[in-house]
A protein has these predicted regions:
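Hydrophobic small-molecule pocket/channel-lining residues, especially in calycin-type beta-barrels
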Residues: 1-157
């Protein structure tokens, strides 16, 4: 996981299909991976803003960890698509410079989604993200992908 740790930024076309999203236009993405509890787990956060409106498009957190009982890698999280709350969980695989999540999600309104996210480290400062096999309440949605650059700017707290 170490090569993924840090902040990643991009501008991209908006993805659609999830309840609460405005489905067209450009979005600004900030994704961050950081270690938790002596490198026993990783927190992944997303903050995505719709460029035209300045409104929240997606925000959320996921915890990436190993299940002590099974030894398998797992993902669980929560957040908002627009103003619609969701929670999700899934499995995780790490293959060389690629992380693959297979996610199940449900919104506060009981909308159910399934999707796969592939995060590939193409270079030390270049991360590609693909969202595929997206189904919302059983209806297939368009795949989506973008490339993010490592944010090397530092800010003081």
């Amino acid at each position: 996981m170490q090569p993924f740790i840090g902040s990643w930024v991009a501008e991209s076309d908006a993805y659609g299909g999830f309840e609460g999203n405005e489905e067209s236009g450009k979005i600004d993405l900030v994704l961050r991976f950081r270690w938790l509890q002596e490198e026993a787990a990783v927190e992944f956060t997303s903050r995505i803003i719709h460029k035209k409106t300045g409104k929240q498009f997606n925000t959320g957190s996921k915890i990436l960890s190993r299940d002590a009982a099974t030894g398998k890698l797992q993902v669980f999280g929560y957040g908002y698509e627009g103003d619609v709350y969701f929670s999700n969980n899934g499995t995780m695989e790490i293959q060389n410079s690629k992380i693959i999540w297979k996610m199940n999600e449900v919104s506060i309104n009981k909308t159910k989604s399934k999707y796969t996210v592939k995060l590939t480290l193409e270079a030390p400062k270049l991360l590609s993200v693909q969202m595929t096999d997206v189904f919302v309440d059983g209806k297939k949605q368009k795949d989506w992908s973008t490339k993010l650059h490592r944010n090397t700017k530092t800010t003081s707290n």
